[in-house]
Amino acid sequence: MIAPFEYSLSTILSLFSKDQDWKRTDNPTFRWITTSSSETKARSLFVPLRGTRDGHEFIPDALSKGATAFLCEKNHPILKTLSNADQSKAIVVSDCLLALGVIASYHRMRFKPMILAVTGSSGKTTTKDLLGGLFGFLKQKSLVVTEKNYNNEIGLPFTLFRITEETRVVICELGMNHRGEIARLSRITKPTHALITNIGSAHIENLKSREAIAEEKIDIISGMAESSVLFVPDDLDFLYRAKLKKLKTKIKLIVWNHKEKPNLKVKK
């Protein structure tokens, strides 16, 4: 993945200052941020991630294609294999995936669009696309909608990197593969509005019950301010109410269902 990225080196360093032993005196400006060495361009910030292979292995390739700097996890052995000149381009972090989220959250907080986050056991993508269609009257640069399945800790930041001063509405899909992920994604996104589509049996092998799944989904409020709005289905709304009461939050709760006549309608 790659996205436009207009930040100075000093700005990125300031986000991770406690981990740095920085020796360079220049302050170049990045033009791109990428997790793929094959997509790296000149003036990129390369973020190596661990998957089937360790992304740190591709740091030399990214540097050969013009990367200005790269993130690197503290004490990673790849550093000892690099020249002194290339070592000087390392921005040391404790975890590259978490660092990507920190950078994305910093970018998101520079702007003030309405951000609507969608999660649930099913129907997330359809709902996200429908909401995107409802805001289709906006100019192209004013609307950002999650593309493809970019709904996890890797893809979500690249949705947020598309936000600019012209952006008025952002529709984000938040997915979940393991416990705690929705909370982390919400803290990165900081939604102004959130919608839970439903609570089904997806992930029940890990979470054991629909109630536990509902608890996990409501963690979408983790990054929401008290002026935010949460839309939830009516079948487990008692859990949502109890959670909000326990947290003593003033997030507004709107319960919806598929059966009764709606009391809210969308107008252009």
Q: What are these model-predicted stretches?
A:
Residues L49, R210-A214, K250-K268:
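Adenine nucleotide phosphate-binding catalytic loops in nucleotide-utilizing enzymes
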Residues G51-T52, V93-C96, N149, G175, ...:
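Short beta->alpha junction loops/turns
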Residues N84-Q87, L244-K252, V266:
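Short, basic, low-complexity termini and linkers enriched in Ser/Thr/Gly/Pro
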Residues M1-V102:
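N-terminal leader/targeting and accessory segments in enzymes
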Residues L71-I78, D234-D237, H258-K261:
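Short, polar loop motifs at secondary-structure junctions
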Residues D19, K23-T25, V93, T146, ...:
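Conserved beta-strand termini and adjacent loop/short-helix elements that scaffold enzyme active sites
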Residues L98-L230, D234, Y240-K250:
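Phosphate-binding loop of NTP-binding sites
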Residues K89, S142, K252-I254:
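Conserved beta-strand segments of alpha/beta enzyme cores
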